[in-house]
């Protein structure tokens, strides 16, 4: 895939100003600036015009209904995987209450603090990935001490316009003017970015739970609260 990314440059030129804007990100990811600009949607013609950046399809939920998966094309998936391994994997995680999308942890680790508790409360976050918008993703990258311009470029590479038609069961990418970009469920970068974007929520719920004598943990969009006191205030 890397060879394809370099090869399809094919002599097409990118303006000097725009190329300079992507030079730093190109150095970090070791991918041509021209390719990064194209995958950000800044130049959409030729190869990219006929090949969508994401393939979207519905996936049935266990509890009924569907969730829409937005799977990136091979070139974009390659870039996103590079972002994941070079920028997201080394980043610290607020690990006291989060076990999803983390190496060596599973749903079992999420459930352990609540086993045998007298009171257990479960709830789901609605639209976990789509609710993490472009500006929230920018903020995540800025929180990693990445400057504004690079954060914007990285947010462009890891978000897309999402639109789902609940009646027809179809989903598609929106036009830029029709909504705000958000995390696509299906991109390799989305799980960690969603976890990082939820950090403030986790810390607030963790603090509130401790004050009330509860344990709190989150596994992706599943929130669980528990207390050993059968008379605990809910």
Each PLM stretch: what is its role?
Residues 18-20, 67, 74-76, 87-88, ...:
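Nucleotide/phosphate-binding site architecture used for ATP/NTP-dependent chemistry
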Residues 2-9, 60-65, 178-186:
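A short, surface-exposed helix-loop junction/capping segment
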Residues 27-39, 86-87, 91-93, 137-140, ...:
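N-terminal low-complexity, intrinsically disordered segments
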Residues 1-45, 50-55:
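Non-catalytic, polymerase-adjacent accessory regions of viral genome-replication enzymes
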Residues 113-220, 224-234:
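Conserved polymerase palm-domain catalytic core
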Residues 48, 52-93:
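Active-site substrate-recognition loop segments, prototypically the cytochrome P450 B′-helix/B-C loop
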Residues 40-62, 153-173:
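Reverse-transcriptase-like RNA-dependent polymerase core
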Residues 77-129:
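Active-site-proximal segment of RNA-dependent polymerases
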